[in-house]
């Protein structure tokens, strides 16, 4: 057994050997007005910014297709409020569901540069943003949600890649040849669950949703694409959670599921409801 373990250790990937760093750019030390500053730009921040910008551009591309639910210039408000929804919703949900101890020192909530965001909370924030834009511009929020859903996997993909670069949110111990030894996770090789999520929530979900958008009449059934997104993300996250190491402070909950899996259940239910009822909302171009 010891010899087998040694041979396996030789075949796995050592994260440190990949030469990855969470810091994208080191801007050096600055001395301004008596203050010493050392600004660093992290890949995680760039992933969020790039994901939002690319999703914005992709929504504008989708809006060029027949039957657009809003004018291109109205996307400016949508992007602003969606970005705010991602930051506020993502951070608050992380604190409430994963790190409630932060509430003992509320100022810690604002330290976004230290990480700690919930994808579920970010989605809720985006849906609230869509509702606000819909209300102020008298639009169909379900149709807007359909278009946002088709673009959202872009941000999910980049975010999961950033998780991998950061060497965080690693998977459970694994004997697979592509297992990775993360320096902060001990000596055991682990599933690169961040990349599993990038593939499922990012690449596959993007391909499926946009096939539905261009090759079927799904966009003529308001809420159907948004429903596909919710179900697709929920199932992807639920599956990958079996390979992902549970959060240390939570572990596996009393009913045998992780917090991530538990939070996907209402998401999948809501998505199924949107899909099933979408036929009643059919529109014509």
From Swiss-Prot:
Q: How does it sit in the membrane?
A: Multi-pass membrane protein
Stated EC number for the protein is 2.5.1.145
Q: Which UniProt keywords apply?
A: Cell inner membrane, Cell membrane, Membrane, Transferase, Transmembrane, Transmembrane helix
Sites binding a 1,2-diacyl-sn-glycero-3-phospho-(1'-sn-glycerol) sit at 160
Any one Gene Ontology MF annotation carried by this entry is:
phosphatidylglycerol-prolipoprotein diacylglyceryl transferase activity
Report the InterPro entries cross-referenced here. Lgt (IPR001640)
Q: Name one Pfam family in it.
A: LGT
* EC primary class: transferase
* UniProt main location, coarse: membrane
Describe its function: Catalyzes the transfer of the diacylglyceryl group from phosphatidylglycerol to the sulfhydryl group of the N-terminal cysteine of a prolipoprotein, the first step in the formation of mature lipoproteins.
Return the similarity comment.
Belongs to the Lgt family.
Protein name (Swiss-Prot/TrEMBL): Phosphatidylglycerol--prolipoprotein diacylglyceryl transferase
């Amino acid at each position: 057994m010891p010899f087998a373990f040694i041979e396996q250790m030789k075949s796995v990937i050592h994260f440190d050997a990949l030469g990855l760093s969470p810091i994208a750019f080191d801007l050096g030390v600055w001395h301004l007005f008596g203050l010493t500053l050392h600004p660093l730009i992290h890949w995680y921040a760039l992933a969020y910014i790039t994901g939002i910008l690319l999703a914005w551009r992709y929504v504008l591309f989708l809006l060029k297709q027949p039957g657009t639910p809003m004018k291109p210039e109205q996307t400016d408000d949508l992007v602003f409020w969606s970005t705010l929804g991602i930051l506020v919703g993502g951070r608050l949900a992380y604190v409430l569901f994963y790190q409630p101890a932060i509430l003992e020192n509320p100022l810690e909530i604002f330290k976004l540069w230290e990480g700690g965001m919930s994808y579920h909370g970010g989605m809720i924030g985006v849906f609230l943003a869509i509702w606000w834009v819909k209300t102020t511009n008298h639009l169909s929020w379900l149709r807007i949600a359909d278009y946002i859903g088709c673009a959202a996997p872009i941000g999910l993909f980049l975010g999961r890649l950033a998780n991998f670069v950061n060497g965080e949110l690693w998977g459970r111990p694994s004997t697979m040849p592509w297992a990775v030894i993360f320096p902060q996770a001990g000596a055991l090789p682990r599933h690169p669950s961040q990349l599993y999520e990038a593939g499922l929530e990012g690449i596959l979900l993007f391909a499926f949703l946009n096939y539905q958008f261009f090759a079927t009449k799904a966009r003529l059934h308001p809420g159907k694409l948004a429903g596909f997104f919710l179900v697709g993300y929920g199932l992807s996250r639920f599956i990958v959670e079996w390979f992902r190491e549970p959060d240390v402070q939570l572990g596996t909950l009393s009913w045998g599921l992780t917090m991530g899996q538990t939070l996907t259940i209402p998401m999948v239910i809501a998505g199924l409801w949107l899909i099933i009822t979408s036929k009643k909302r059919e529109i014509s171009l």
